[in-house]
């Protein structure tokens, strides 16, 4: 072990990786996942879907361009930790307002650098997503393992990240009124809707069908978010109550929630999909899209039979369901992130499809 290494990350199977700390200096019990994106660490760090998780970045250099005021995906990051090979404390970017470490300290995000992140990512790929503890290097392993065995990871994180009261994101010359259920919505989703002439009313995850309809929306959007979709029962009930009454579009967690509302089921993937280069085939056009993804759960393909939902997109790496629709109810959803941030913009047309649906086309 390098003598300069003052921190370690220990996995629930006892595997240890040593490094040096940056960001917040505290112990952190986390769910450990990995992301293969080369850039976009700021958007990843501020994505509410990573709540209570620590992200292993497989790209070796993180922090090179600092943190830019325009690139946050939430006002207050809720990620627990960041694991990197090397972080840059002196970024070179005219847009940078702060360093990565400054932001991590402000929001109590634990960091560990000097780790062989590609080896760690392979371990997660082979053994699966797991609990991990980031602690001082001298902390006895026996004590760490005992703490992980006795402490459960938090659940129902949607309740943590959702807005507490409705708010409006206006746009010039609005053509449509969209109600967006905030399960952990990213800023660029709202920007993508605003750019297409939608006034967006962002509402808490506990909103009722009656409250939504009282706003007289042209469409309903169900956002991304953290955790198990089965924990989001109020949103499942909302979709069940409003399906067929107005156009509905869901992304990521919203995709899973829609499946559950129709009677399908979901399951947890071994290590999830997180990165900016996942190939997805659009079964309606035959085209392949390169997509940005961040999720632990997926819809069971065989559970869709008899629900009224049909598969529209599939993942070309593992065959999982990436899109679904019920044309009769004017509802559709995708498992990936068409708003990118970070990632490719191959799937931005889905927002246009939502607009067309609200216009009755």
Mark where each language-model region is.
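RNA-binding accessory domains that recognize and position tRNA/RNA substrates
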Residues: 1-210, 214-215, 229, 341, ...
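Active-site glycine-centered loops adjacent to acidic/histidine catalytic or metal-binding residues
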Residues: 116, 252, 295, 337
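Residues that mark the start of a beta-strand
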Residues: 175-179, 199, 247, 290, ...
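Active-site-proximal beta-strand elements of phosphoester/diester hydrolases
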Residues: 177-182, 291-292, 332-336
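Cysteine-nucleophile active-site neighborhood
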Residues: 219, 223-290, 296-301, 343-353, ...
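Catalytic beta-strand/loop cores that center a nucleophilic Ser/Cys/Thr
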Residues: 287-329
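A glycine-centered loop/beta-turn motif at secondary-structure junctions
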Residues: 323-360
């Amino acid at each position: 072990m390098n003598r300069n290494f003052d921190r370690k990350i220990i996995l629930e199977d006892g595997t240890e990786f040593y490094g040096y700390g940056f960001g917040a200096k505290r112990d952190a019990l986390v769910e450990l996942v990995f992301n293969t994106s080369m850039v976009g660490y700021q958007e990843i760090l501020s994505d509410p879907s990573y709540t209570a998780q620590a992200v292993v970045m497989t790209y070796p250099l993180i922090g090179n361009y600092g943190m830019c005021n325009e690139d946050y995906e939430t006002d207050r990051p809720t990620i627990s930790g960041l694991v990197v090979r090397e972080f840059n404390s002196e970024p070179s970017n005219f847009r940078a307002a702060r360093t990565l470490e400054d932001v991590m300290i402000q929001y109590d995000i634990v960091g560990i650098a000097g780790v062989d992140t590609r080896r760690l990512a392979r371990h997660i790929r082979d053994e699966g997503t797991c609990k991990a503890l980031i602690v001082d290097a001298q902390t006895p392993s026996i004590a760490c393992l005992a703490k992980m065995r006795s402490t459960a990871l938090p659940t129902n994180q949607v309740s943590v990240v959702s807005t507490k009261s409705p708010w409006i994101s206006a746009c010039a010359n609005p053509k449509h009124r969209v109600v967006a259920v905030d399960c952990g919505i990213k800023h660029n989703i709202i920007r993508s809707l605003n750019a297409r002439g939608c006034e967006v009313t962002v509402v808490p995850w506990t909103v009722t069908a009656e409250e939504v309809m009282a706003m007289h929306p042209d469409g309903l959007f169900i956002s991304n978010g953290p955790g198990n979709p089965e924990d989001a029962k109020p949103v499942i009930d909302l979709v069940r109550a409003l399906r067929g009454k107005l156009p509905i579009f869901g992304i990521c967690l919203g995709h899973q929630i829609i499946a559950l509302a129709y009677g399908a089921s979901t399951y947890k993937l071994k290590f999830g999909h997180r990165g900016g280069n996942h190939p997805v085939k659009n079964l309606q056009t035959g085209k392949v899209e390169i997509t940005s993804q961040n999720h632990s759960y997926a819809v069971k393909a065989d559970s869709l039979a008899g629900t009224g939902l049909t598969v529209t997109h599939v993942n070309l790496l593992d065959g999982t369901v990436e899109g679904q629709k019920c044309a009769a109810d004017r509802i559709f959803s995708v498992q990936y992130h068409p708003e990118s941030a970070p990632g490719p913009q191959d799937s931005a047309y889905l927002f246009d499809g939502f607009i067309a649906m609200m216009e009755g086309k």
